[in-house]
Regions:
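Transmembrane alpha-helices of multi-pass small-molecule transport proteins
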Residues: 2, 28-75, 154-158, 177-192
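Structural signature of hydrophobic alpha-helical transmembrane segments
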Residues: 29-43, 82-99, 141-154, 198-212, ...
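Helix-helix packing/entry segments at the starts of transmembrane helices
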Residues: 36, 93-98, 165-180, 217-247
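Hydrophobic transmembrane alpha-helices of multi-pass small-molecule transport proteins
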Residues: 118-135, 151, 257-276
Length: 281
């Protein structure tokens, strides 16, 4: 039960993180938001890593792997923050959910993993759901709608890149170095887009760091306390939170086609999770 609660709270925290980021995009570049988020979150990530894993969690055996992961993290976050400047929170969130489909496809095509025909059908169905949401060629189509899909692809690469990290490193080490490399790499570019931070916005930057770090920590703990097949599908509750937050703060109400496409994506993703679990067993 604790794992389920942690997963639900963690997902909700990340949705608040996204809502705060959307608010900040009204006055700041996505790159500056990302830099500030990682910079403020770094002390929290350090303390969490030390508390959960001790001194060994602070050391990396493959720093270049973390550098690559940090680059992917910056790219994914930048594209997503850019997308929510123009798209509704629920629409962008729904499209992000194709990440598990990308993971399955990449694993099969490039990593030699065995993927049965049922999972391939689920992947195809999920991408059909993307077409329903994006509606290319339609009057409502926006090119920026492809950014969350690109974000999902890069995020899939980020998840798969965890395999290149030394097996002796804990998830807390990964969290710490992801935050640290994200802050370091974005620091080189952020002067190009930097604007002075208004005093009234400081709490928003602190909030995005706190909720983002808390969300990642709680979700990590959830997978440690409960079977993945139980907690992983709860990630899709983000669509509910994104819809509520988008409606409350921006009066965003997704249309019927967006909900239909999102439902297809979610069902496909959950099916893949369940099939992968049964294959492992």
């Amino acid at each position: 039960m604790a794992g389920i609660v942690m997963m639900c709270v963690g997902v909700a925290s990340l949705c608040v993180n996204d809502a705060l980021a959307k608010t900040l995009t009204e006055g700041y570049s996505p790159l500056q938001i990302q830099f500030m988020r990682n910079l403020i979150a770094l002390p929290f990530a350090f303390l969490i890593a030390f508390r959960m894993g001790g001194t060994p969690a602070l050391r990396s055996h493959r720093p270049l792997a973390h550098l690559l992961r940090g680059t992917l993290w910056i790219a994914a976050t930048f594209m997503f923050f850019t997308s929510i400047m123009y798209l509704g929170l629920a629409e962008a969130t729904a499209l992000i959910f194709v990440a598990p489909l990308f993971i399955t496809a990449i694993s099969a095509m490039f990593l030699g993993e065995q993927v049965g025909w049922r999972r391939w059908l689920a992947v195809l169905a999920g991408f059909a759901g993307v077409l329903i949401v994006v509606r290319p060629g339609g009057s409502t189509f926006q090119l920026v709608s492809l950014l969350p899909v690109a974000t999902a692809f890069v995020y899939a690469l980020l998840m798969l890149s965890a395999r290149w990290v030394d097996s002796r490193e804990s998830v807390w080490t990964l969290l710490l170095y992801l935050t640290a490399t994200g802050a370091l790499l974005s620091a080189f570019i952020v002067p190009l887009v930097w604007v002075p931070v208004r005093l009234d916005d400081v709490w928003l930057f602190v909030g995005i760091a706190v909720f983002g770090t808390a969300g990642m920590t709680l979700m990590t703990q959830a997978f440690r306390l409960a079977p993945a097949v139980v907690v992983a599908p709860l990630d899709y509750t983000a669509l509910l939170w994104a819809t509520i937050l988008g409606w409350l703060f921006w009066n965003e109400i997704p249309d019927a086609m967006t909900f239909i496409g999102a439902a297809v994506i979610v069902v496909s993703g959950v099916f893949i999770i369940l099939r992968e679990h049964s294959a492992i067993e």
